[in-house]
């Protein structure tokens, strides 16, 4: 989702004002507005008719001792939950990346690079992308927390035995110690993600390192 959102957002910003940009913007807004559980239900209806497994983590009867067949089966069960969450978050990344690149492309040094005759690819790669990554780094760090909220819905739709499903079941059973543990894990994950984001900031923006 991150790679796709960055690439599509970059293209949309470079071709801003065109039909391609309008199509990308509509696609991003549409996918961003979709609830993750609704996306999961749509995938079940489209891909679940004998093509891919629609629930659980593994086909009943398979064990880790079965070797490669077990892990292939787990991968097949993971396809639809992964796609459901990736589609929704891709739209958000497209909008953030598009906005960041459009802001950078209006800077004077981009106009100077164009005046020097640099190619479009080099301008985007060497000048625009790095500076437009700062808002993306923040959003990626915040997504770690949001992902658990989306995972609760997706794991419930697909009956996937993960952290989100554990939180959902704990709420239903009023199992407060388990809820406290999952909330603590979530908080630690968000703190670590924000710490990594601050470190990446210093790498991408030397002014942060100087401060």
Report the location of each language-model feature.
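Membrane-water interface segments at the C-terminal ends of transmembrane alpha-helices
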Residues: 26-56, 77, 84-90
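Conserved active-site segment immediately N-terminal to the catalytic lysine
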Residues: 23
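Alpha-helical transmembrane segments of integral membrane proteins
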Residues: 1-20, 36, 61-211
């Amino acid at each position: 989702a991150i790679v796709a959102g960055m690439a599509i957002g970059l293209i949309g910003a470079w071709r801003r004002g065109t039909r391609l940009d309008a199509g990308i913007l509509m696609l991003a807004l549409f996918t961003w507005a979709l609830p993750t559980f609704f996306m999961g239900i749509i995938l079940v209806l489209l891909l679940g008719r004998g093509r891919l497994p629609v629930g659980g983590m593994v086909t009943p009867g398979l064990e880790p001792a079965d070797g490669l067949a077990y892990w292939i089966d787990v991968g097949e069960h993971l396809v639809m939950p992964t796609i459901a969450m990736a589609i929704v978050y891709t739209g958000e990344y497209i909008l953030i990346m598009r906005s960041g690149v459009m802001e950078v492309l209006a800077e004077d040094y981009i106009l100077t690079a164009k005046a020097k005759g640099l190619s479009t690819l080099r301008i985007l790669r060497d000048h625009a992308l790095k500076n437009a990554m700062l808002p993306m780094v923040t959003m990626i760090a915040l997504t770690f927390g949001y992902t658990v909220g989306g995972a609760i819905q997706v794991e419930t739709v697909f009956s996937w035995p993960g952290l989100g499903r554990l939180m959902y079941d704990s709420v239903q059973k009023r199992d407060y110690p388990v809820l406290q543990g999952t909330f603590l894990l979530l908080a630690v994950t968000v703190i670590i993600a924000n710490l990594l984001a601050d470190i990446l900031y210093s790498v991408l923006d030397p002014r942060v390192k100087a401060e």
